[in-house]
Design a protein with these regions (language model features):
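Catalytic centers of nucleases
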Residues: 15, 19-83
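Short, hydrophobic/amphipathic alpha-helical patches that form generic packing surfaces
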Residues: 21-30, 316-340
Length: 344
């Protein structure tokens, strides 16, 4: 996307379509993903996360490109965010978000080395607390300081959105350190969702939409070689291309069938609970005990019916399918754990 003219005093400092507001909205959502039901962006600076209990978190995003400008200018922008936040008396959190390192002075500076740094109001120095309270009283802002938080998000330089990429990668590495997709692609999909929401004043972004994109990216990037390695399968290299051809279509189609998925994963859970194998051996030991020639689905047998080693190849592929379903279950659970997300 083409870069637009930058307004250094608004939330809309841009990099390839990533406005600071969009980054801030996504981060607020991800940091509260376990509790979130929906979120939205409103106007040019407002961010709202609606929780499962229908309570809400309100945030204001203020950005600037000149970190060397005098502190008072940055502080004034923080106060502008407080003006709007104070009106949201029904919110349980009120967050002022900026990319200013020192909007409150040296004593309450944010960590420049971190992509995300958070400060609760009570953790600020007494001097800063009194300054904010005094300014709020002078302007008539009735802010509940027990709910008030300040966040710093690093968003500057030639490619400011790369801070978000590193932030996401640090989370995704906990799910799958050998991921085979670009986090930039995931960010681009999320950007499109948020951009559409910014123009759509009627509907919020559902948690399931963001999570579904994440689940799909992680699982659709799974390589056949990963599953082969999981179960230490010795596959003749001359058959790898045929297996690869059948792999994506069969796995994506059949692992989505609820009955198949739940039956396999239920048996897998029972096996793991009863035998308590080492984690690195779970998949291999399970498929060896679970996969029998008589249980191979007919569509797998049909695919290999013209091969000389059709029985062994069918069994090998069936083992890969069973291992993939169990792998998928564990990946989904890892995503939920890392992002604190549970199905409604």
């Amino acid at each position: 996307m083409n870069k637009k003219e930058i307004n250094s005093s608004s939330a809309n400092a841009q990099s390839n379509g990533w406005t600071f507001q969009y980054v801030a909205a996504l981060v607020v959502f991800l940091e509260n993903m376990g509790l979130a039901k929906q979120f939205c962006v409103e106007g040019t600076e407002d961010i709202v996360v609606i929780l499962k209990n229908n309570e809400k978190i309100c945030a204001q995003a203020k950005s600037g490109l000149d970190q060397d400008s005098i502190v008072s200018l940055h502080f004034d922008r923080i106060m502008l965010s407080i003006e709007t936040l104070a009106a949201n008396t029904d919110a349980i959190q009120l967050i002022s978000i900026s990319n200013f390192h020192k909007p409150l002075g040296d004593d309450d500076a944010f960590s420049y080395m971190q992509f995300l740094d958070k400060k609760n109001f009570e953790n600020l120095t007494t001097k800063t607390q009194n300054k904010i309270k005094q300014k709020s009283e002078e302007k008539g802002y009735m802010l509940d300081f027990n709910k008030f938080k300040l966040w710093f998000i690093r968003f500057e330089g030639a490619e400011p959105e790369q801070g978000l990429a590193h932030y996401l990668n640090s989370k995704l590495e906990k799910i799958n350190p050998n991921q085979y997709f670009s986090v930039d692609d995931l960010m681009e999909k999320w950007l499109n969702i948020i951009q559409l929401n910014a123009r759509d004043k009627e509907n919020n972004i559902e948690t399931e939409m963001i999570c579904g994109t994440l689940f799909g990216k992680v699982l659709n990037s799974t390589q056949l070689s990963q599953i082969i390695k999981l179960i230490d399968l010795e596959l003749d290299p001359c058959y790898e291309e045929d297996f690869e051809r059948f792999f994506k279509n069969y796995f994506s189609r059949n692992s989505q069938i609820f009955k198949i998925y739940t039956l396999i994963t239920a048996d897998y859970d029972v096996f793991v609970n009863n035998t308590k194998p080492k984690k690195r051996e779970q998949y291999k030991l399970f498929v060896e005990s679970y996969c029998k020639q008589e249980n191979i689905p007919n569509d797998i047998k049909t695919f290999f019916e013209n091969y000389d080693e059709k029985e062994q190849l069918s069994l090998d592929f069936y083992k890969l399918f069973i291992a993939y379903v169990c792998y998928k279950k564990n990946v989904v659970n890892s995503i939920r754990e890392v992002f604190g997300y549970e199905d409604n």
